[in-house]
Amino acid sequence: MQATALVVTRRRIARASGISAALLILLSSAACAGGQGTPWGAGQGREYPLHTDITATTFWVGEVFDADAPDGSQVYSTYDKDWYASYGGCDGAVVGGVCQTEPRSAANGYFPTRMTAEENPFYLDLPFDDVNNASAAGMRQRVVPWAGDAAYSRGLEDPSFSLMKNRWVQLEHDGRTCYGQIQDAGPGEYDDAEYVFGAHDARPANERYGGAGMDVSPALNSCLGFAATNGVEGGVSWRFVDEGDVPDGPWSLLVTTSR
């Protein structure tokens, strides 16, 4: 982030004694409410293409929307087979033995209210799985813009090392700008390089879930002002951003670093 020492301090506070409500109100007011945030292309790092008018659906850690589908459970992610435990449990509320989502509020930085998150609640997926999809894995060195960066190039020979996990994405919807980290792959497709990395604003190859090009967490759902707590929302714009271009906000209070 912009101030490494400050972020490290906040991470320690978050894990040791819980998130400060007053700090979260300050951050969410400055970065989320009223559509305030970093303007598109205002960062100092690498520039990435903008993807516009994308449909997003909502998912959450612990959700099981189709127990019979190979990609129907968020108890695990393609990058973390123990995602549920790593995150700290159901990212919402367990009702009748079922993990359900819940409304989020800027008052506590869009964090869950009935559990303590151990990883960043601002997470999403994109349809490029460079670990478990052979097609995506085979092309990742060629298509992923940061594949040659020192932090990633040494992992190229390790098929279990993802170039996607934990990468930052800037999202805009209805005048609101928020940020999140990639923690899974989907929806529906897993090697859609033209859409994910292309420079010509290609449409997602996925035709399911309203043609969605991403899933976003409950925190991002609320931060972006989606109409439904668990629904499909159009009109989302997004682009990759380097970590140094991510401004302080509720998304930077608990940054996921697990590989």
What is the meaning of each model-derived region?
Residues 33-259:
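Secreted/periplasmic proteins
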Residues 5, 32-33:
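Composition-driven recognition of long, C-terminal low-complexity regions enriched in serine/threonine
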